[in-house]
Amino acid sequence: RVDRIDPESKTVYLESEKMIPYDTLSCNVGSYVPMTIVSGADRDIFPVKPIEKLIHFQERVLELTSQQKITIGIIGGGPSAAETAGNIWRLGKYYCKNMPDITILSGQKFMARFTENVRSRILHSLTKRGIETLEQEFVREIKTGEITMESGQVHHKDLILLAHGIKPYTVFQKS
């Protein structure tokens, strides 16, 4: 297992203390979503990383929407939140008995690091599909079925998807 990478010496250091030199290196180590804002049991709370978690989320959406209309909250204001919202909408439109209501809780500003043109086009695309985007406030805590904002306001959701603060695994932090 990789511990760290030294690009200066072009060496990969393993946890076993073995060293592997390289000429060219491709790193596909993945990333994860911090779960620090989740308290208590995490039933029906799914991070977007690793990708296997999204498969479980999809199965749960199909299961619940076969019985009733549900609400889905997506935590995050970047490309992952936008992409997963669109994918959930498509899943709902073509495969769900009951279309879910989808809300993105994006923190201060949705797609903040992008130009206003890009941001407004994405917002328009989501809005015309009935996907709500809430801005201007960060999430303080998440429990099963409940998203609490910093103001204390609570949003009740049947399923919660975490697409915020995606981090690379520690191999790059050590390198």
Segments predicted by a language model, with ranges:
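FAD-binding core/adjacent interface of flavoenzyme oxidoreductases
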Residues: 1-73, 161
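Flexible, glycine/proline-enriched loop segments at strand-loop-helix junctions
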Residues: 44-45, 75, 109-113
